[in-house]
Amino acid sequence: MKTISGFAPTSTVGANVLILGSMPGIASLERRQYYAHPRNVFWRIMAQLFDFDVNISYESRLEKIAAEGIVLWDVLKNCQRPSSLDADILASSVVPNDFSEFFAKCSSMRKIYFNGAKAEALFTQHVSRQFASQLTDVQLSRLPSTSPAHASMGYEKKLSCWRDIVA
């Protein structure tokens, strides 16, 4: 099975909110864009929360959320996964991202939101203990996954939960 690699974090300039996924799905990896699957509601939610047109370019969407102090990244740097499903991540293949460099650059980080349960579990298992001292003043919160695989929760309920990032 081939090892897949995630992306670098988006702009960290002035960031105080980190939204963490687990590992980009196949559609995102192919397009080299966070949350690129057409049925992933992440960008639809961001557009509604921060009042921009969801159809603007990917680069413009990144600029809009960066202006709100938000940076996107994933817990994992590398892993093996035969599909886009988090449940298919081969545990023995997991390599977390380098959070030491990230936290050094983003000392003003105040909130970390996990886009789904798997991102939170991977962070807890592979990252949080190592960085306990950097995380003492950081709020950690899990939000419902925006992935189409988490279709049991409707859009309006997801949007309601995600409103927490603007509070």
Predicted regions and their residues:
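Short, surface-exposed acidic-centric catalytic microdomains
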Residues: 28-90
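Internal catalytic-core helix/loop-beta-alpha segment
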Residues: 67-122
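C-terminal capping/extension of enzyme domains
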Residues: 1-13, 37-38, 85-97, 124-167
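Short, hydrophobic/glycine-enriched beta-strand segments
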Residues: 16-22
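Short, solvent-exposed loop/turn segments at secondary-structure junctions
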Residues: 24-27, 41, 77-81, 117-121, ...
